[in-house]
Structures are given as structure tokens and as C-alpha cells.
Amino acid sequence: MQPKGNKYGTHRVIEPKGVLPQPANKLDNNMDVLYDNEILIDVQTLNIDSASFTDIHNYAKQQAGEGAPVEKVMEEVKKEMLLNVELQGKHRNRRTGSGGMLLGKVEKIGDALKGKINLKEGDRIATLVSLSLTPLRIDEILEIRPEVDQVDIKGKAILFESGIYAKIPNDMPEKLALSALDVAGAPAQTAKLCQYGQTVLILGAGGKSGMLCCYEAKKRVGVTGKVIGIANSPKSTQRIKDLGFCDVVESAAGMTPVQVYEMVERLTDGKMADVTINCVNVPDQEMTAVLCTKDDGIVYFFSMATSFTKASLGAEGIGSDVNMIMGNGYTKGHAEFTLQELRESPELRKIFEELYA
């Protein structure tokens, strides 16, 4: 008889007791015992959160030493990932606090869930809850793909009863679906936040979440609205220009928040943005977003590199009366919503296939 589990997975928390799995310092990742309300997953790929992978990669380069070959850097990435799991029983970045998601096959379903959910053993799924709360065991790291933040492994994971997931669709490659589902909350939230005729600013427009948000924002604001895409690297700037989803595309490479503010002020004739969406995967972008948004406007911080303290105190410090939404990656129906964008837009699907599939 399987032991009874808590809906939210608190039975897997080792330390400190009484907290939920996400903030817990350590989880029980023993996969030999399955609780009655858990789903055991045979893991194929970890899709590491962009902010987390960027941090791990930068840390690995420091550890490997200046000028170290790529192979040495990747070995350091492996060490850091394995250490995260060894110390915590899950893959939560010890500096950013963020995780990611995974792709795998349902290996076993707890007795209390069998027949009550739309899953069966053998189904291929992507988890839509963070790796920062998912019990994980890594047996072997097979391949690291730093350009897409994906790591193929041999290992097991647990999805709790409250955990959400998406079945991998039949009409697109698994890696393509995984890459889109990783950021599914961003375009779905964009659809809720943007209205006809508004000016929408997207920071990090040339990245994975940024491209999806640009596409959705333009649909929502229509011909009388304006979508401004700001990217960083020359490559990402050209990428979002070529897609044609934005009315204006600019590069912010090497610019300070004040310089970006002055650029947006010029582009909007001093009116600033109604909605600003921050998809940048590095820290210290909070004030750029706040400065560029008009009073009573909305700033949506999708990036996991966001500091609530910097955003809230920074906004207060300049007397900015903006409404801030902090990294809410979930909204109802977000998985199917985002996959549908790839079906709707041949341009978007093509670039995602080239970059991520």
C-alpha cells in the first residue's frame, strides 16, 4: 500500500518542516517510494529557466578560468547542476532561486490519482511547474545545449497532485513544444494586459518569451496601437526586426536605464508606454521598465531575474505610480494558448524551429 501524500507535496519537504516545496531548502528525492497522489516521471530533458542558465553558465566560465575551452566550461555546468540537486533534492539555482521545467514520460501514477486524471503511463508530458519545487534525481547528464538552455539527462522526477502539466502535442516536435511551454505564461498574460490602441514596450524582445509577447501584443493593440521592441544583442535585434511583429525595434546594447528612458520618451512623444513587459534574463533591469511606463500603466516582470525590492523601492524613489505584476508565469489555459501561437504564425514557428527544435 502506498503512503498517503499531501496535495501540495509537503510530505517531501525535509528542511525546514512546515513549508511548501518551493521555498524548502531540501526535498526528499528518493524515487523508490511513490506516494499515492504523485506522478513519477522518467525525465528526458530539463529546460532550465533562462535567468538560471545564464547565471550557471557565467559561474561555470569563472570556475573554468579565462580562456577555458567550451568542454571545460560544460563540465563546470554539469558540476553545478549536480551540486544543486545533491544539496536540495531539486534543481533550484542557489543564486537566482529559479528553476525551469522538464520533458519526460509518465512512468507511474499513484493509486489515489489513477483513473481520476487525463494521464496514463507512457504519456509524454511537459511539467508546467518550476523545477525549484520538483523532486528530481539526476543519474547522468547526457548533453547540454547552452544556446537553448536545455539539458538532456537520465533521471526521475515527481509531479505532485497540485502540479500542472501539458501533454506533448502530435503536430510539433517535442523540443519545439518544450521551448514554447517553458515561457507559456508570458504571451498568455500579455493577451490579458494589452488593449486596443495602447502603446506596449517589450524589453528583451528578441528572446524566446519576448518574441511570443511581441506577436501577441500586436494582435491586441491593433492598427491604432504601437508595439516597441527593445533587444540587446545585434543578433536578437535583427531577429525581431525580421519577424515584423513590432512597429519599432531598437537596440539597447550598452545603454543605461536613463538612456533607454530617453529613447522611449522620444519614440512615444513623451507619453511613455501603457504596458511594459520585461523579458530580459539578467538582473538590474527593473528601473528601465518602471521609467518607461506612464503613471497608472502596467509593468509585467516576467523575467526570473527580477528583484521585487529593487522594483518596488525604485518605483517609490522616483514617484512612479505604476501597477507591477511580478513574474506570474501561470494563467488558465496558458499552455494551449501559447502552442496555438506557433500554429497561427508560420514566421514564429519557423524561427522557433530553427533556434530551439
What are these regions (language model features)?
Residues T190-Y196, T268-G270, L291:
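Glycine-rich helix-loop-beta junction characteristic of Rossmann-like nucleotide cofactor-binding loops
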Residues P257-K271:
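Short amphipathic alpha-helix with an adjacent loop that forms part of the alpha/beta core around
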Residues V85-H91, G100-L103, A112, I125-G197:
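NAD(P)H dinucleotide-binding glycine-rich loop of Rossmann-like/cofactor-binding domains
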Residues G270, L339-A357:
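C-terminal capping/lid region of NAD(P)-dependent oxidoreductase domains
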Residues V280-S345:
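Glycine-rich phosphate-binding loop and adjacent beta-alpha segment
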